[in-house]
Amino acid sequence: MKIRIAARGSKLSLKQVEIVTTYLQAKGYETEFIEIKTKADLFGNKPLHEIGKGVFEKEVNEAVLQGRADIAVHSMKDMSSELPPGLELLATPKRENPVDVLVSELNLEELPEKSRIGTGSLRRANFLKVVRPDLVVENIRGNVDTRLRKYRDHEYDGIILAEAGLRRLGVEVKRFPLDVESFTPEPNQGIIAVVGSPKFLGLFQELNDTGTMKEALAEKETVKVVGGGCHSPLGVLFRLEDDVLHGIASYSNGVKRVTVKLSTRESPQIAGNQLGKALVKAMKDEGLIP
């Protein structure tokens, strides 16, 4: 039997597809890759938060719903909160390191005033403005290779990227991890999602990492409570340790940042809900929302 896999054609997306392909081929399945060009790929210079929620996801899922592919593979951070009817989250392989990193010759404290920092993320831009308001935040788009080329061509003094993407691509570049309190990662950063018909649930059982799935569901629940998609200035991270979910959520308008934390043995849905409600309360208390 052949399984057709829909995904974007970027180098990072292909690395993620490779993980799923290797798993399926080891189980004796043939695989076929269906490349999908999304609206976000076509509007390469626009900031991501201006294009809209679920922008990398919609067309890829449509290929499955229309029968052109059997499953879709996504960076889970690019997915909107709800999947369309007929599709389910089938598996989340083990999560890669979820932190943000500063690619630069100098760490964040050492960078001189007015250093130009490139990011295409409103969340990263706002968090950076709180920590180092004296730096110049500039929009950057393109895949990881393009961003690194622009950095190496001295268009920027530093760029902020996800550690997970650099690791999956095997990129060796000087970089500094950013602490999760000041730069709480994007919800589901470092997680790959396999999406498709519920009939495939059994097939992907062994690929699924239950700890990663719990973290993913808790983070999604927080996003649902707070509102805002993958391009809002919201950071959420859960880590599962000894059956305890440890969560942190942060929101910033570029002037103030609020951060809340919790640890609980409750289900991912309850944990995410509680963290989301705590963040909304903190945002109201600080006057970030009415």
Swiss-Prot record:
The modification S-(dipyrrolylmethanemethyl)cysteine is found at residue 230. Keywords: Porphyrin biosynthesis, Transferase. Disulfide bonds: none annotated. It is an enzyme of class 2 (transferase). Pfam families: Porphobil_deam (PF01379). PROSITE patterns: PORPHOBILINOGEN_DEAM (PS00533). It catalyses: 4 porphobilinogen + H2O = hydroxymethylbilane + 4 NH4(+). GO terms for biological process: protoporphyrinogen IX biosynthetic process. Its EC number is 2.5.1.61. SUPFAM superfamilies: Periplasmic binding protein-like II (SSF53850), Porphobilinogen deaminase (hydroxymethylbilane synthase), C-terminal domain (SSF54782). Binds 1 dipyrromethane group covalently. Its cofactor is dipyrromethane. GO terms for cellular component: cytoplasm. GO terms for molecular function: hydroxymethylbilane synthase activity. Pathway: Porphyrin-containing compound metabolism; protoporphyrin-IX biosynthesis; coproporphyrinogen-III from 5-aminolevulinate: step 2/4. HAMAP family: Porphobil_deam. Tetrapolymerization of the monopyrrole PBG into the hydroxymethylbilane pre-uroporphyrinogen in several discrete steps. The porphobilinogen subunits are added to the dipyrromethane group. Belongs to the HMBS family. This is Probable porphobilinogen deaminase. It comes from Metallosphaera sedula (strain ATCC 51363 / DSM 5348 / JCM 9185 / NBRC 15509 / TH2).
